[in-house]
Every structure is written in C-alpha cells, then in structure tokens.
Amino acid sequence: MAKLREASFCALACVLVLFLSFVSADTYNRQDKQVYVVYMGSLPSQPDYKPTSDHISILQQVTGESSMEGRLVRSYKKSFNGFSARLTESERKRVAEMEGVVSVFPSKKYKLHTTASWDFMGLKEGKNTKRNLAVESDTIVGVFDTGISPESESFSGKGFGPPPKKWKGVCKGGKNFTCNNKLIGARDYTNEGTRDIEGHGTHTASTAAGNVVENTSFYGIGNGTARGGVPDSRIAAYKVCSGAGCSSEYILSAFDDAIADGVDVISASLGGDTAYMYEKDPIAIGAFHAMAKGILTVQSAGNNGPNPTVSVAPWILTVAASTTNRRIVTKVVLGNGKTLVGQSVNAFDLKGKQYPLVYETSVEKCNNESLTTLALSFLTLTPQSNEQIISMFHTLIMWSPKATILKSEAIFNQTDPKVAGFSSRGPNTIAVDILKPDITAPGVEILAAYSPLVSPSATTLDNRRVNYTITSGTSMACPHVSGVAAYIKTFHPEWYPSMIQSAIMTTAWPMNPSGTDAVSTEFAYGSGHIDPIAAINPGLVYELGKSDHIAFLCGLNYNATTLKLIAGEAVTCTGKTLPRNLNYPSMSAKLSKSKSSFTVTFNRTVTNVGTSNSTYKSKVVINHGSKLKVKVSPSVLSMKSVNEKQSFTVSVSGNDLNPKLPSSANLIWSDGTHNVRSPIVVYTDYASSVDIF
C-alpha cells in the first residue's frame, strides 16, 4: 500500500511539473497581458462609422498584429463607444494616447452581494393591490447576474402574450436554452451560456419579477407563495457573473446591450470590494448612460457591513438589506436537556438523535469522514444565549457532550424591520455630501427560485437540489426595489429615473436606530424602509436630469477631461453645483471637525405630481436627541397645477457635533394626503480612513 502511495505521489508530481511548465510558457507568451477597458464615450453621429472596425484598427496600430484573435474581448457599439482588449502595460499607454480614446482602465472583478417579503411591504397579491396590468405586461426588468434557470416555474411563459413591441433584444442563452414570452431575452458574456449554475441570478430575477407560484418552500420551511413585485412584467437576463466573479468588461457590455434592448429597469446585485471614483467604475459609467436614456439602475449596497457601501453614485438607487416580520430559527437541544435558540436555516431532521458537539477550535482533530456527515449542521446563536454559550464552552473542555439540532421553523412577530449586520453602511466615501445607502428593503431569509444545478449550500459535499431556497444578502434586497421601481413605472411610464427614485425614497417608512453608534443611523438605512403602495402616489418629487448630474460632478471639481470619462462626450462646466445642493431627495453635509458652531444650507426644488390647487406645509422632526435647529423657507408651498415646480431652502445650524454620531432630522412636506419626507444628516469625520481607487 505504501509503495502504491509513493507511485501515485511520483506520478502526481510529474504531472504537476509538466503543468507548471506549460503555465510558465503560457505566461511568457502572454507577456503579462491583462484585460483593459477602452472607453471612447458616446457613439459618433456619422452614419458610416463602424465601431468594431475602428476598435480593430486601433489595436492593430498599437500591437502591430494583423489578427486580433485573443486580443479583442468585447466591442461596445450600441449605447456608447469602446472595447475591451488584452494589452500589455506599454500597449495600454499607447492606446490611452490615441485620438478618440477617453480613458483606459483595467478590468476589475466584482462580487455578487449574496415570499412573505412582498406581503410584509404591503404589496399583496389579489384585488386589494392596485395594478395596471396592461402596462405591467409591457414593462421589462433587466437583471445583471449569474444568468437564469429558464425552466423554472417562476419564469414560465404560460398566459403571456408576445413581447412588447419596444423590445429590441435577443435570446442568446446558449445550448438547450429557450426563452419564452415571460423570459424574453438572454445574453451571456462569460462564455458559459446564460443558464444559471450558481443560483444567485435565478433567485434575484424571481424576486424582482417572478411569476406567482403557490406552495413553495425550502423543505417545508417558509411555505407559501413565491412571486416577484411585478409578476406580469417581462424579464431579460444578462449573465455578467460566473463563479470567478463579475468582470468590468462584461458589466459594460451588458449596459451597452440592455440600453439598446429597451429594458425599463436594471437590477444589479453586485459590486466591488470598495468604492471607486466614478470615472473608474464601470457600473457608475454604464448607469450614467442608462440614466441619460431614461433607465433607472438599482444596485445592492454590499455585504461588508459595517464598512462603507460600494454603490455611491447619485444616479444609482442604492439598497440596504433589512429583516421582515418573519424569522427562521433553529433550536439546539443539549444532552442535559437545555435548549439554545439560534438563527439559521436547517432543513435536516435528525429525529432527535444526538451527535458529538465539537467546539470550533477542535475541528482540526476530527477525521474527514466524521466532518463530512456533519458539515452542514451549524447555526449562529443569538446574543441572548451568551451565558449558556459560556457554560457550554466549559462543558466542552471537560466532557464530550452531545446535542441534536432541530429542523428550522418560521416564526412571525410584529417587531420593526432592522438593518442586517452584513449590510454595508454610509457615509459616502466619494461624494461625502450625498447620503448612501438610499433605501432599505427585505434582504434576510428571502424565499425565491433557485437553480437545480447547484446545491443550496453551494458546497460540493451537498448533493441536494432544490427549485426554491432561502438566502440573505443585499443581493436579495436589491431586486425588491427593482420590482417596486418597475411597479411605479407601470403607473407613470413617462417618469424619469430620478422621479421614480424620489418617489421610493420620500415615501419610505421611517426607521429607528438599532443601536447607539453611527452605523445604526441613516448611514444604515438611508431614507427608511421601502413602501411600494405609497410610492406610486408621492405627491411631490425631486427631479434630476443629465445636466444636473454634470453640474454636480463639476462641484466635485471634475473638469472637461474627467467629465468626458463619465458622460462620454465633450462637456464643460458652465456652472457648478455644491454637491449638497444636488436636487436629491435626501440632504446630507459633512462638516469640519474644527467648527464648534455651524450653519449649512440646502437648496431644493420639488415638482407637483399630485393634484392641482394643493398646499404643502413643512414640518421638521429632530431625531436621535440631536440639538439641531432647522429652518425651512418658505415654509408653505402652494401648487396651483400639476407639474408645477417650486423651490425652497433648508438652513441647519447647531453646535459641537458629536464626532462619533451624525446629527439628523426629517423634513416633511404634507398636504394632508401626502407626506413627502426627506432625511437631513450632518456629520463630521468620525469614520476611519477608507482607501479609494
């Protein structure tokens, strides 16, 4: 046996040496090439301009090679101009100097930010919920993710008519992939095919716009009806992510296609590890072009809480994750009869049989076979169990205890939603006077469709396959907001992205701090918890267009050169807007620590989308024991007609800001029917430094 092991080891070593030699040779041949995104701005207006030919010509000039096979990765030629290619560092520099090239930046890997929730938000199924089904059927949600499972009942085309006439997309899902009148589009950028082999994309797509599917559960847990926010709408899947991550060039390709395809809302449950300057962020660049074409991009805040969110552009709606009134709990029964309650999703029924209880640091002493059988049996204990945990720890040292884990169960309570600990927080690390995240939505223990090609635990030891599963993340919160954005669009097809964003933010449920530190305040939940029903009739909205965002960027000291990096066209700063004076639905200002007293003003303009001859009176509510003084001028707005605009100024003053806690208030405009609420946040530099790339 020992000789056999030695022979096997030698054979493996030989194979490894050969493999490494091939890798070394391949690396030498590549000459340290990596994928760069070459951004060339807006498409030229000349009718005879051929983007791909231009891109190939640029590469041929730089590389001296005639064939671009293995060089050109993608051409962006529908909604903006550019390409991605494999270049050396010296080639990158030469490309950057060529005429027509706006910027060149390396492709980065982005990560995925990985049902009763709709009922919890008030968007219930049936006659009690107002719907515009004819328009909903013409609404298209574009999902940027790991693809989709086309056979899922959540995406069945049964009962749907042909795709909307505005749809210009295609179904290129790969082998054995078929679209239908529900799932009307599929594109793959990963060379894996659009079929979802990770599960993430199927889950998010069904949360946003999946069909109504009754009697769904995860092994009986969370049993009920699974559905999206706009079940009668259409879905287009753009696979930009694989198991290796989500590449910049894929994301930009998806924006290029989705804008041209005719989607109404883009849902992107993904992001980087840290916030990037706007001109270096493919999501910010793509979303800017989408905004200019009337398409709202909704992005997850990230799962790095309490660290800052990676989604920081004001033209993107940034979503934090919160709990609902349903909790899934698991009980551990110790050998002495004591019961510990924890939060996890455990589908196993051990039928009362007890197994050895292993403390974390002792796992290395177990053999592989014993760990294999118990690899999926674990849970996170609640803080209330602290004393029992300490007692159990001492028991583990002295004895060899056993325990059994009971199957999880769903319990309902009426506690307020709380922001999940994993949800990334503010402040905004790029534009410090723009409050992020914007809104909070359910993202904990969400039941939705799943890919049958991967286990629910995503581990190789798990052989289970399910059509629906329960998971958590800001990735799950993001499609809830995407669904609500599409829902609003069905009632107001003519609204700009900023109007939809404003409606969602100003009608949100107020949330209370869950703790006494900064990460428990508006930096956690933004404007509050989303309220879909109120959002379709907000009364007033804060409007923003492309020119407003350009003025905002000018206020961040962007010049004509750097502006072109984002807008994709020659733009000059004819006027600057202080970032805090961007006509944003929330108001935020970072102040110097050196000032003991301060006064800061915010200028805003609202548009009446309610009724004519309405009078709105202002009310200010001071939060968290803050000692702010807030003055609104004028304090009354009289709107004679729909679409009328009126401006006002908010002056905030105070003394000695708490360096560890933001001071905040709420401004509410009310006409007796509508309550248009905007959070006001002032803070100093309490946070630790964050690296910005």
Curated annotation (Swiss-Prot):
PANTHER family: PROPROTEIN CONVERTASE SUBTILISIN/KEXIN. GO terms for molecular function: serine-type endopeptidase activity. Residues 354-396 form the PA domain. Residues 1-25 form the signal peptide. Glycans are attached at residues 176, 215, 223, 368, 413, 467, 559, 603, 613. Residues 26-113 form a propeptide. The active site is at 145 (charge relay system), 200 (charge relay system), 475 (charge relay system). Keywords: Autocatalytic cleavage, Glycoprotein, Hydrolase, Protease, Secreted, Serine protease, Signal, Zymogen. InterPro entries: Peptidase_S8/S53_dom, Peptidase_S8/S53_dom_sf, Peptidase_S8_Ser-AS, Peptidase_S8_subtilisin-rel, Peptidases_S8_3, S8pro/Inhibitor_I9, S8pro/Inhibitor_I9_sf, SBT. GO terms for cellular component: extracellular region. It is found in: Secreted. Residues 117-536 form the Peptidase S8 domain. Its main location: secreted. The C-terminal propeptide is autocleaved. It is an enzyme of class 3 (hydrolase). This is Subtilisin-like protease SBT4.10.
